Amino acid sequence: MSGLSLAQQLKQLHSNNVSVPDPESAYSNLDSHDIQRKGDEGREHYVDVGPSRLRMELGGTGGGTLTGPKYEGVKTGRMKIFDDDDDDDDDREGNGSEEGSDGEGDEDEDGDEDDEDEEDEDEDEEESDEDEQGEDEDEDEEEQPQPRANGSKQALDPVASLRNSRLKDVEKGQAIRKQKALFESLITLRITFQKALTASNTVPPTLPEDPENELAYKKASILKSLGELNERLFTLRESISLPGELGEDVSLGKRKRAEGDDAQGQAYWIKAAKESLGIADRSHPQLLPILNKWSSKIQAASLQLGSKQAGGSKFLQQMKNGAGGVVEAIESGINSKREAEKTLMESEETGYRALLREVIESRSGSGPAADLTHLRREKKKKREAERGGSKGRKLRYTVHEKAQNFVVPIPLSHGWHEEQVDELFSSLFGGVGMKGATAEKTVGLDVGTADEGLAELGGLRVF
């Protein structure tokens, strides 16, 4: 640089063809001066052990799996690598790859002997372990490359992959369908068992044995009281005389009933029934005109009352519902006896169901009460015109639908708060709550199984 003038130095700086030295050019000189080996030069100390048994089997009968042409490899050098990458674009983009290839080349050149040494050592180990390894391991080694080849074929075949994915989806859908069917069957089974348990609770318990002939004593006392009532009715019938009826028609003979004798008692009741039917037959001609007379009078009076008061008379309502009232009274008496025999849980179940239904309807805002309040609000709806405006201009407005979501929430006037609901459930079943009801419901059952079932349900009781 010192022999050049200043103008020449500036010209070299501004010129585009600046010669940049290539540091990789030194490797080509080394390759050109590389000493070629002849034969087994430098490997005289190696011991020839021959191929291993596994390699011989794979090479001989295994179709040349490890000795095929694709496993042989290709010898190359740095000159050939650099000759293939002469393009400028490839050099600029792949500088890192060239450095990696140089490193690999160094490793290949420097480690050829190491690889051969490792292969020889592997062959020695295989020969030393021939007695320990069996033929099963050899067969496994032969079968290993086949699944890899099949997997590579499937990966390259998109139709097969789509078919496999579709088959998996079909299997998944069938499994989900089976799961849903199983779930429905389990629900049906659970409902059936629940109904059976409820029905078993309604079955009356078995009657106890008769202690000391208590049933016979009660039967005799009931028959005695019925006999006394029968005699009183016959005496009353003899004292009543209908118009046109003779005294001989009403006269009845004496009936004797021996207590403690079933045969004589049966004969007594048969005779009393015959006499009662005979009296009814003899008094029928006299009773019929009397009943027709008073029936026509009552019917005429009821029609007059109905036309005047439109059925508002209590007497008229009683006359209309006379027969039904008797039946209802009898049924109410029977139901009261049944209710007396029921437990606390069974007797209060209907009332608690109604209370729970009211709670749910009030919380959800559905039901007849909510409908009535909605109708009242519709009637009392505000006018569209604003009253604050003057007479000449009425301010009319409509609430935007999207703006309704931003209105402050107004609590329900008749709604139930959380504290009220908690208080209701805590006061159920006479103040014992859900736990006390479930304890009473499980009387007669196994205590251990009942406690486990309640623990799983968390104290919740399903009616």
Curated annotation (Swiss-Prot):
Q: What is this protein called?
A: Protein BFR2
Answer yes or no on keyword Nucleotide-binding. Answer: no
User: Highest taxon of the source?
Assistant: Eukaryota
Q: Does the keyword Cell cycle apply?
A: no
Q: Where in the cell is it found?
A: Nucleus, Nucleolus
Q: Where is the composition biased (Acidic residues)?
A: 83-92, 99-144
Q: What is its main location?
A: nucleus
The ranges of region (Disordered) come to: 14-174
Residue spans with biased composition (Basic and acidic residues)?
Answer: 31-47
Among the GO biological process terms of this entry, one is: maturation of SSU-rRNA from tricistronic rRNA transcript (SSU-rRNA, 5.8S rRNA, LSU-rRNA)
InterPro entries noted in UniProt: AATF, AATF/Bfr2, AATF_C
Q: Which family does it belong to?
A: Belongs to the AATF family.
Keywords linked to the UniProt accession: Nucleus
Where does it sit, as one GO cellular component term? Answer: nucleolus
